[in-house]
Amino acid sequence: MKSLLKTLGLFIFFAVPVCLKAQTMEESLSKTLMKMDSVQNLSEMMNVSAQFDMLAAKWENEWSTNYYAAYAKIIASFIVQDNKKKDLFLDEAEKYFGKVKTIDSQNDETWVLAALITNARISVDGQNRGAQYGGIFNQNLSKAEKINPDNPRIYYLKGTSLFYTPEMYGGGKALAKPLFEKAKELFTKEARTSVLKPNWGEKQNLDYLKQCDEK
C-alpha cells in the first residue's frame, strides 16, 4: 500500500504541473484572442501579434501557440497597405506554419492555415500570383478536406477564392454562394468547447453571403 501511495504521489506531483501549464496556456490564448477581436488598426494588431509571439516562445512545442502566432501574422498582412510589408508578415507566418506542420501534420486545421497563408499571398497581387499559388491553395484545402470534410473553414476559403475570381475565369458570386451556404451550415454545428481548436470565419462567411445577394 505504501508503495502504491508513493507511486500515486509521484503521479500527482508530475500531473498537476502539466494540468496547470495547459490551463495557463489556454487562458493566455483566450485573453489574447479577445484582444484580437477588438483590434481597430494595424498598431493594435501588431501588439496582439507580439503577444502571440511571446506565447509561441513560451510554449514553443505546442501546436496552438504556433498556430495563432501564424494566424496573427496573416491578419496583420491583410491590414497593412504596403505590399512588401504584407509579404514580410507572411514570411513570418510561414515560419510558424513550419512548426505547426511538424507538430501535427494530420490536423485538418494545419492545412486550412496553409491555405489561408497561400490565399493571403495571392491577395497581395492577384493578377500575377493567381497562377503561381492557386494550385497550392487548392492542394492545401484538399488535404484538409480528406482529414475532416466537415471543417467549415474549408468551404469558406473556397468561397472567398471564387468570390474574387472574375466570372470569365470561372469564378463569381453565383458560384461562391453555395460554398458560403455550406460553410454556414457547418459553422452552426461546430463545437466551441476550447480556444485550442480554431473557430474563426463564421462572421466573415455571413458577410460574404450578404454580398452574394447584393446586385
Region annotations inferred by a language model:
Residues S38-F52, K85-Y96, G130-N138, K177-K184:
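Helix-turn-helix repeat elements of alpha-solenoid scaffolds
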Residues L175-P178, K182-K215:
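Terminal, low-structured helical/coil segments at or just beyond the last alpha-helical repeat
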Residues R129-Y164:
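A contiguous pocket-lining binding segment that forms or flanks enzyme active sites
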Residues T24-M36, K58-V80, S105-D125, N151-T165, ...:
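Amphipathic alpha-helical repeat scaffolds of TPR domains
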Residues D87-Q139:
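Hydrophobic, well-structured mid-protein blocks that either form specific transmembrane helices
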Residues L55, V100, K143-A144, A183:
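Canonical positions in the second alpha-helix
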Residues M1-L29:
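Bacterial Sec-dependent N-terminal signal peptides
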